[in-house]
């Protein structure tokens, strides 16, 4: 009975308010008392984090922790795209007729994901996509998958359904309905890319390094703006972070790419490992 009621319940929850409240709680000094329990529960490897766990002032600060520089080597080569995050591949494949796969029997469109811009969406038709789920135990900083220029970003307010198996299998067009922040990247030889950071239930917010854009704002409005100066970011450099677990979707325009060995549905990825390469 409980399992049958749960899918219906997630539609009725005040998801955004709950997530903002969670963000406030995890930012209190009191929350640091939960850090050691969090480490133990999720079996987090503290040997690779930037500083001792005792030096984090809040649970939110620990959650968005940085790693030691050598912890995530970046796969070299101008024709190699790397994983922007640590996580698990939930879906990947070709973008056929402007459609992405969420789960068996559940699809959604590129246009919906990018906020309804058909012009923006069409450049990815015939390209590739990969959806990577970040669990609460994962490293939650987001990095550049390639060296490229940041041309624009789009903030899309929405719901905050859970992005775990329960949400993916029971919420139609979940990733096109949840709040998200899209960064558009232009590269020298690998085509355009869109890095979509998807909000989720209990995600305090998503933040980026290139401006003050953030998510989970009360009464937030859709925004699409050019990024001042079109800054160039190197492959592997930090782009932003989640303040709790969530999902990243990477759209690749080029149809001349192939997935790297071991990049498959259900497989774990580390930030910086080879994701795709240009066909020889």
UniProtKB/Swiss-Prot annotation:
Domain of life: Bacteria
GO BP term (any one): phosphatidylethanolamine biosynthetic process
Cofactor binding, note field: Binds 1 pyruvoyl group covalently per subunit.
InterPro entries in UniProt: PS_Dcarbxylase, PSD-B, PSD_type1_pro
Pathway: Phospholipid metabolism; phosphatidylethanolamine biosynthesis; phosphatidylethanolamine from CDP-diacylglycerol: step 2/2
EC number: 4.1.1.65
Keywords noted in UniProt: Cell membrane, Decarboxylase, Lipid biosynthesis, Lipid metabolism, Lyase, Membrane, Phospholipid biosynthesis, Phospholipid metabolism, Pyruvate, Zymogen
Predominant localisation class: membrane
Annotated catalysed reactions: a 1,2-diacyl-sn-glycero-3-phospho-L-serine + H(+) = a 1,2-diacyl-sn-glycero-3-phosphoethanolamine + CO2
Pfam family, one: PS_Dcarbxylase
Molecular function in Gene Ontology: phosphatidylserine decarboxylase activity
Positions of post-translational Pyruvic acid (Ser) modification: 246
PANTHER family: PHOSPHATIDYLSERINE DECARBOXYLASE, PHOSPHATIDYLSERINE DECARBOXYLASE PROENZYME, MITOCHONDRIAL
Role of this protein: Catalyzes the formation of phosphatidylethanolamine (PtdEtn) from phosphatidylserine (PtdSer).
Subunit and partners: Heterodimer of a large membrane-associated beta subunit and a small pyruvoyl-containing alpha subunit.
Record-given protein name: Phosphatidylserine decarboxylase proenzyme
Organism: Brevibacillus brevis (strain 47 / JCM 6285 / NBRC 100599)
